[in-house]
């Protein structure tokens, strides 16, 4: 860890505890700051807050009183999920108090360079692929962020010869000031999180913060097939490395003659790749680009692609029952992810979909329903998905209250050779704590059919 003195004896407000807030508060105390921790949940229900209080921190729970800002606050470190419309953040901004997220702290203390990966979809798969390729190539990667350990915990132990690989959301990237990844990858962009950002434009600009501090000594890995990403890459001063699944890229990554190429050199045959789905070729090209920029051999990349079958809850194969294959794609929390999942199969599909209503309609899914023989909907968006399915002319459309019921109905509508696919196209928070919980419940329900 770098020697950092900028936080010594400063009053710093950590807003929202959870994993990242707990780690940030603990780190800041270690760096000599006077830490004030604030969380909306009452102290009696907040185990992490009680632990921080026991460490001698000033803990205020049960709301976000504006009076906290009267304590000569030098910096606010916010939980990524707390919107900037929260009154305490609005007031902090008016007082010109800097507001950052935990990844900014991680960068400031890390001896190791960062690889940052963002995009609307594919972040986790690309991050895991990158980590595995670098590990196989003996480039000493450590993984941080939404996967595994919180970034500022990882950064404390990261050495100069290592590289921190981290998945970055728009929520996290809104709170960066000095963060400068050696390699920044921007995978794709489409309309999402409008309840947080307001517009697609603001959402895209938040993502583009990944380029904010890059220089000509850094690299920006950019999806040449996504017009929005290409436009936002104008914010990067780094060396641009493009990747494409549709056209040849001489100075980047592409697919040619059934093989993946990087800067004109064949790296791996498509036939060696075991990860299913056309959309995953984009993720692989991005990860391969990062790995090659860091000196990973073609052999190491090939070894990984021959064994990497995917990430849990992302087109995860569950089991086969009476020649029906079941797949868990609970991470499909938006339409684009579900579109890509539906495009991954040629067999007839029984689709399970539904979840939190964020205000959007689902007509964009209609062109992807060509292999869908039946849909079972659940959650807040069930009526909207039913309308889209009716417009698509599906013969079998059913709505149920719970995911357990949906699994039973989906199996009843399936036949020999079909795929039964959970790909909700919605966030999980109407009925579940996380998309992981939703996926686990789906898997449990499937195994009950056996």
Curated annotation (Swiss-Prot):
Pathway: Cell wall biogenesis; peptidoglycan biosynthesis
Catalytic activity: UDP-N-acetyl-alpha-D-muramoyl-L-alanine + D-glutamate + ATP = UDP-N-acetyl-alpha-D-muramoyl-L-alanyl-D-glutamate + ADP + phosphate + H(+)
One Pfam family of this chain: Mur_ligase_C
EC number: 6.3.2.9
Binding site for ATP: 119-125
UniProt keyword terms in alphabetical order: ATP-binding, Cell cycle, Cell division, Cell shape, Cell wall biogenesis/degradation, Cytoplasm, Ligase, Nucleotide-binding, Peptidoglycan synthesis
Disulfide linkage: none
Main location: cytoplasm
GO biological process per UniProt: cell division; cell wall organization; peptidoglycan biosynthetic process; regulation of cell shape
Alphabetical list of InterPro entries matching this protein: Mur-like_cat_sf, Mur_ligase_C, Mur_ligase_C_dom_sf, Mur_ligase_cen, MurD
Enzyme category, top tier: ligase
GO CC annotation: cytoplasm
Compartment(s): Cytoplasm
MF term (GO), any: UDP-N-acetylmuramoylalanine-D-glutamate ligase activity
Family: Belongs to the MurCDEF family.
Family matches, as PANTHER family: UDP-N-ACETYLMURAMOYLALANINE--D-GLUTAMATE LIGASE (PTHR43692:SF1)
NCBIfam families cross-referenced by the UniProt entry: murD
Functional summary from the UniProt entry: Cell wall formation. Catalyzes the addition of glutamate to the nucleotide precursor UDP-N-acetylmuramoyl-L-alanine (UMA).
The protein's name in its UniProt record: UDP-N-acetylmuramoylalanine--D-glutamate ligase
Species: Bacillus cereus (strain B4264)
The encoding gene: murD
């Amino acid at each position: 860890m770098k020697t950092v003195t900028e936080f010594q004896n400063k009053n710093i407000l950590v807003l929202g505890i959870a994993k990242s807030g707990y780690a940030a508060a603990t780190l800041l105390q270690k760096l000599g700051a006077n830490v004030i921790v604030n969380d909306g949940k009452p102290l009696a229900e907040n185990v992490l807050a009680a632990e921080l209080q026991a460490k001698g921190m000033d803990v205020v729970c049960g709301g976000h009183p504006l009076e906290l800002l009267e304590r000569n606050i030098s910096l606010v470190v916010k939980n990524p999920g707390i919107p900037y419309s929260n009154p305490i953040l609005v007031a902090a901004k008016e007082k010109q108090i800097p507001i950052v997220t935990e990844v900014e702290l991680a960068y400031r203390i890390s001896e190791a360079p960062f690889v940052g990966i963002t995009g609307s979809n594919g972040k986790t798969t690309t991050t895991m692929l990158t980590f595995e390729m670098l590990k196989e190539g003996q480039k000493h990667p450590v993984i941080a962020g939404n996967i595994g350990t919180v970034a500022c915990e990882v950064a404390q132990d990261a050495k100069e010869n290592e590289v921190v690989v981290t998945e970055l959301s728009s929520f996290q990237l809104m709170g960066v000031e000095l963060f400068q990844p050696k390699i920044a990858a921007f995978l794709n962009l489409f309309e999402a999180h409008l309840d947080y950002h307001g517009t697609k434009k603001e959402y895209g600009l938040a993502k583009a913060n990944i380029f904010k501090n890059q220089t000509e000594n850094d690299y920006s890995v950019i999806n040449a097939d996504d017009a929005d990403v290409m436009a936002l890459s104008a914010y990067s001063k780094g060396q641009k490395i493009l990747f494409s699944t549709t056209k040849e890229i001489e100075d980047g990554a592409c697919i040619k003659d059934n093989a993946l190429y990087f800067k004109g050199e064949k790296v791996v045959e498509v036939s060696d790749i075991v990860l299913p789905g056309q959309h995953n070729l984009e993720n692989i090209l991005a990860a391969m680009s990062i790995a090659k920029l860091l000196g990973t051999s073609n052999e190491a990349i090939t070894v990984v692609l021959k064994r990497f079958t995917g990430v849990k809850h992302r087109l995860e194969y569950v089991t086969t029952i009476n020649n029906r294959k079941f797949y868990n794609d609970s991470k499909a929390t938006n339409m684009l992810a579900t579109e890509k999942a539906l495009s991954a199969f040629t067999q007839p599909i029984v689709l399970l979909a539904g979840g939190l209503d964020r205000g959007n309609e689902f007509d964009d899914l209609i062109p992807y329903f060509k292999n869908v023989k039946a849909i079972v909907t659940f959650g807040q968006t069930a009526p909207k998905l039913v309308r889209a399915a009716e417009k698509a002319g599906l013969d079998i459309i059913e709505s149920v209250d719970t995911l357990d019921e949906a699994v039973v109905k989906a199996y009843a509508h399936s036949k020999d050779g079909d795929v039964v696919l959970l790909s909700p196209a919605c966030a999980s928070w109407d009925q579940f704590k996380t998309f992981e919980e939703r996926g686990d419940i789906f898997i449990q329900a499937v195994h009950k059919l056996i």
